[in-house]
Amino acid sequence: MSDLQAEPAAVDLLAFEVGGARFGIELTAVREVVRAVFITPLPGAPPTVEGIIDVRGTVVPVYDLRTRFGLPIQPLHPDHRLVTAWTGDRLVALHCERTEWLVSVPASAMERTGAVSLGDRRLAGVAKLPDGIILITDLPAFLDDAERTALDAALAAASAPPHGTSERAGGPPERGAST
């Protein structure tokens, strides 16, 4: 018999700061961290969506963690970061003041809560570390069904051609051209 026990599994997180609070998302969901760029407002989107950005030709909604978690609103600053991550088949961005580090959290330091909603706070769990707590966001639960529907409609409206225009290529016929 062996006295050896398997090491508990660890979860790799990207930790970041929003409104003085420490959050994290599982590293497997993260695509990249980019410098803050102008966030275009998205009419019709839920308040938890700050707007949209263009990431290499892809329109990406920016989730507003401050609104979702009841933190003070802070204007976009050039030093801020946008964490792009996958939630299901949608690429989203999280606006944060700064990314802190990559951390491997042992299972013993994790308290999984499932998709717990504390008021409007959606968390996948809490990582208890010697230097403090990291709130682990649950990206799939970040938007409720009504918010997801509103975001889908707002994105569809934003990608539709302006009213009164044609999608036909080539523009209007030239003057004097026969039809």
Where are these regions (language model features)?
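An acidic, low-aromatic, low-complexity terminal/linker signal
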Residues: 1-179
